[in-house]
Amino acid sequence: MLEKTMRMNYLYDFYQALLTPKQRNYMALYYLDDYSLGEIAEQYEVSRQAVYDNIRRTEAMLEQYEEKLGLLRKYERRRQIIERLKDYISRRYGADAELAALVRELDELD
């Protein structure tokens, strides 16, 4: 469950601009603020089932966006490459402060 929550948080971060305000609100409350379905339903004066259905549809949409655009996949790949680069530089060029600063700057872009 934690893995799914983390994935949804990342997908939400990347694709939230493509969601409707209602979808954004439900997802933020459920995944970021850890509200229960019942709490969200009460806040919006809808049924728990309506909230559940909306969240599941939104999750499916986020997965479709990722399948087509691959922003999370590319982000994770960049993170892996940067970690390898940092490791290599620290082993081979540990005393090169300028190179270390450039890699740090690159790392902070994500």
From Swiss-Prot:
InterPro entries: RNA_pol_sigma_r3/r4-like, UPF0122, UPF0122_fam_protein, WH-like_DNA-bd_sf
Organism domain of life: Bacteria
A Pfam family the protein falls into: UPF0122
Database matches in SUPFAM superfamilies: Sigma3 and sigma4 domains of RNA polymerase sigma factors (SSF88659)
Natural source organism: Geobacillus kaustophilus (strain HTA426)
Task performed by this protein: Might take part in the signal recognition particle (SRP) pathway. This is inferred from the conservation of its genetic proximity to ftsY/ffh. May be a regulatory protein.
Protein name, per record: UPF0122 protein GK1195
PANTHER family in alphabetical order: UPF0122 PROTEIN CBO2450/CLC_2298, UPF0122 PROTEIN YLXM
Disulfide linkage: none
Family, as annotated: Belongs to the UPF0122 family.
